[in-house]
Amino acid sequence: YWPSMPDPENFDAIDGKPSEEFMADWLVRTCELIDNYHPKILYFDWWIQQEAAKPYLKKAAAYYYNRAAEWGEEVAIDYKFDAYMFGTAVPDIERGQMADIKPYFWQTDTAIALNSWCYTENNDFRPAGDIICDLVDIVSKNGALLLNVGPKADGTISDEDTAVLTAIGDWMQVNGEAIYDTHVWRTFGEGPTKVQDGGFSDGVKKNFTGEDFRFTAKGDTLFAIALKANDNGEYHVHSLRMQEHTAGTVYHGLVESVSVLGTDDAPAWTRDESGLHIKTCLLYTSPSPRDGATS
C-alpha cells in the first residue's frame, strides 16, 4: 500500500460541488429525455465524473436500462473520465483511438471537421478516406465510431458534409460485410503505420501504406481490410503465413478460399511461409485512399 494520490481527472476542486436540488433536476430531465425520445445512446461529455453526481448516475443508468428492457431495445451509455464503474457503460475517447485491441467494447467520438463540432465558416473537413480508415481501425480493436455532423442554422447539412457522408456510405455499401456484426480477431492488424493512443489525436495524419491491414471476423470468415490500395492490385498478408505453431504465428489453420468484396472475380492467391499473397483485378491509380476488403 502507499499514500493515495489525487486523480488527475478529478475536477471537483475547481468546478465546485453541485447542490442536491441541481442533481435531482438533472436526473428528472434525463429520465424525461429517455421517456420522450427512446434514445439508442445516452452520451455524456464531461462533468458527470463529479463525486456528487455518482449516486444520480446510478439511478439514471438503472432507469435507462430498465426502460430499454421494457422496450425490447439494446442501448448504451457513453462516458468519459471513469464517471461510470467499468463494465456498466461504454468508455469513450474523444477525437482519438486505441493503439491496440481491447477485450472490452469502447467508442470513439469525433467530427467530420477537424476544427469544429459545429457548422462554421472555414471548417477543415476530413477526407472520407481518412474517416473510413479510422472506422476500420477502431472496429478491428473492438470499438465503435460515433461521427458528429454539424448542421447549418436552418437544420440542413452542408454540401461538404454530404459529400463525405455519401462517400462513406458508398464504401459501406460494398464493404459493410467486413464491419457490421463482426468481432475482433486474434490480432487487430499488421503493417508499419502506428496509431497514436488516446484522445485528441485525430488531427495526426496517418500515412497508411499498402502493407497496412486491419482484421475483423464473422463466423468462419476473416476479413483483411487494406487501408490503402496498391496500384498493382497485389497484397501480402504476413499474419496468414504458413508456419509451425512454435514459430509464434497468429494463425495455424487452412485458407480454403479468397474473395474480394464488391466483385465476383476470384483473385489469384498463394500461401507460403512469408504470408498470403493475393493478386486482384482491382487496380487503382488515384493517390487518395481506396479501402478494400478481402476474405
Segments from the language model and where they lie:
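Mature catalytic domains of secreted/periplasmic carbohydrate-active enzymes
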Residues: 1-286, 295
